[in-house]
UniProtKB/Swiss-Prot annotation:
Obligatory cofactor(s): [4Fe-4S] cluster
Family: Belongs to the aconitase/IPM isomerase family. LeuC type 1 subfamily.
Protein name: 3-isopropylmalate dehydratase large subunit
SS bond partners: none
Record's subunit section: Heterodimer of LeuC and LeuD.
EC number(s) recorded for this UniProt protein: 4.2.1.33
Single GO biological process annotation from the record: L-leucine biosynthetic process
Reactions catalysed, as given in the entry: (2R,3S)-3-isopropylmalate = (2S)-2-isopropylmalate
One example GO MF annotation: 4 iron, 4 sulfur cluster binding
Cofactor binding remark: Binds 1 [4Fe-4S] cluster per subunit.
Stated role: Catalyzes the isomerization between 2-isopropylmalate and 3-isopropylmalate, via the formation of 2-isopropylmaleate.
Presence of the UniProt keyword Metal-binding in the record: yes
């Protein structure tokens, strides 16, 4: 009888090409996603070496980080961004790679378009020069970010050199209360383990609360695995995953689909499989969560107060949290619901999908954005935007006073015109609240889409459970 195996180990073993005596491995890569920021040097390296892309049919390119989310018929106001976008277009043409430019309705954030095109499939290995590649793990794919030199290596060989990670599991049992979402699950996990808690691990999410999530919700959870330090996040595929993928443009069809399904149905951790570390959370006890500091681990219930660093025994950690409070312009003991806002951003590869926009629109419907707040909604892709408009969500947002934008990474990061000004405070559905992440000296609080929409209307954080 074979030894019980984890989902991660199964996918890893199926893709292992070679293992050296020191544990360094060569693994085969099934899918490679490329965007404009981390790929220029990689393609240039291929040119200099006179190499071709080994498997262009397994590579998909899209612009997302640098594209403006306003009128795209006008020139890009940032020459460097415009150059990166033009460079990706030329590289895709030169190397024979499929490419979605800023005018293609399939364009969007790389981690939104992969699943919606059926490019992301269970049991595959997926890489991209982007840390939030872990998103694709929601489908039972082993997916993680890589550096630019590794992008070149994958383009040239369709393989990657790395050492195997350890296995970790987060079991989220019970049922989520109304007003509490997948975003709150992952923020709670990061708050529990810290931003280094998953270092050296691939993190599998399990339990009834995870199974109950939609695919959009699972993508939100897996997306932020990297914020917990993990190399990748995984959810075993099930009927929800298969239903999401069936009929997608790049998904298998007919007999190929049937063959794929036979393999996909083996993709789960066996009973009794060994995990090097495991944590458990009760979904029923989770509140809507807000980050208060400059790390994703700085989490608190919306009904709570900003913590006092003086209560922290470890000196280095205490000083770090004192610095965070100073940067955020907050005082210990401040009620979270007393924190007022200047900006609200709903979008990103964490929360820019149709389910996220529906949740925000449900809160915004019939209400008006606070006069002191500038709020924007940025769909994760052109297809998400098209679907939202077909459902009338754009009209709800616009009537409420939100800006309705074109798809892209937008205000998740300060690499395009959507930025915070110094000391502006933003409720954001994105994934990182580091110093300067959304703009120089900008202050970021991470929340769910419903929480962000409610904050935009109230002008400060509110407990969205009271609005349900």
């Amino acid at each position: 009888m074979s030894k019980p195996t984890t989902l991660y180990d199964k996918i890893w073993n199926d893709h292992l090409v070679h293992e050296a005596e020191d544990g360094t491995c060569l693994i085969y890569i099934d899918r490679h996603l490329v965007h404009e920021v981390t790929s220029p040097q990689a393609f240039e390296g291929l040119r200099v070496a006179g190499r071709k892309v080994h498997a262009p049919e397994k590579t998909l390119a899209v612009v997302d980080h640098n594209v403006p989310t306003t009128d795209r018929t006008k020139p890009n106001p940032d020459p460097e961004s415009a150059e990166q976008i033009a460079t990706l277009a030329q590289n895709a043409k030169d190397f024979g790679i499929e490419y979605y430019n800023e005018f293609d309705k399939r364009q969007g954030i790389v981690h939104v378009i992969g699943p919606e095109q059926g490019f992301t499939l269970p049991g595959t290995t997926i890489v991209c020069g982007d840390s939030h590649t872990s998103t694709h793990g929601a489908f039972g794919a082993l997916a993680h970010g890589i550096g630019t030199s590794e992008v070149e290596h994958v383009l040239a060989t369709q393989t990657l050199i790395q050492k195997k990670a350890k296995n970790m599991r987060a079991v989220v049992y019970g049922t989520l209360p109304d007003g509490v979402t997948a975003k709150d699950i992952i923020l709670a996990i990061i708050g529990e383990i810290g931003t280094a808690g998953g270092t050296g691990y691939v993190l599998e999410y399990a339990g009834e609360a995870i199974r109950a999530l939609t695919m959009e919700g699972r993508m939100t959870v897996c997306n932020m695995s990297i914020e917990g330090g993990a190399r990748a996040g995984l959810v075993a595929p099930d009927e929800k995953a298969y239903e999401f993928l069936k009929g997608r443009p790049k998904a298998p069809r007919g007999a190929d689909w049937d063959a794929a399904m036979r393999y996909w149905e083996t993709l789960r951790s066996d009973d009794g499989a060994h995990f090097d570390h495991e944590i458990r959370l009760d979904a029923a006890r989770l509140p809507p969560i807000v980050t208060w500091g400059t790390s994703p681990e700085d989490v608190i219930s919306v009904t709570g107060k900003v913590p006092n660093p003086a209560d922290i025994a470890d000196e280095a950690k205490r000083l770090s949290k004192e610095r965070a409070l100073h940067y955020m312009g907050l005082a210990a003991g401040t009620r979270i619901t007393d924190i007022t806002l200047d900006r609200v951003f709903i979008g990103s590869c964490t929360n820019g999908r149709i389910e996220d926009l529906r949740a925000a629109a449900k809160i915004a419907d019939g209400r008006t954005v606070n006069g002191n707040v500038n709020a924007m909604v940025v769909p994760g892709s052109g297809l998400v935007k098209e679907q939202a408009e077909a459902e009338g969500l754009d009209k709800i947002f616009i009537k409420a006073g939100f800006e309705w934008r074109e798809p892209g990474c937008s205000m998740c990061l300060a690499m395009n015109p959507d930025k915070l000004k110094p000391e502006e405070r933003c409720a954001s559905t994105s994934n990182r609240n580091f110093e300067g992440r959304q703009g120089f000296k900008g202050r970021t609080h991470l929340v769910s889409p419903a929480m962000a929409a409610a904050a935009a209307i109230a002008g400060h954080f509110v407990d969205v459970r009271e609005w349900h």
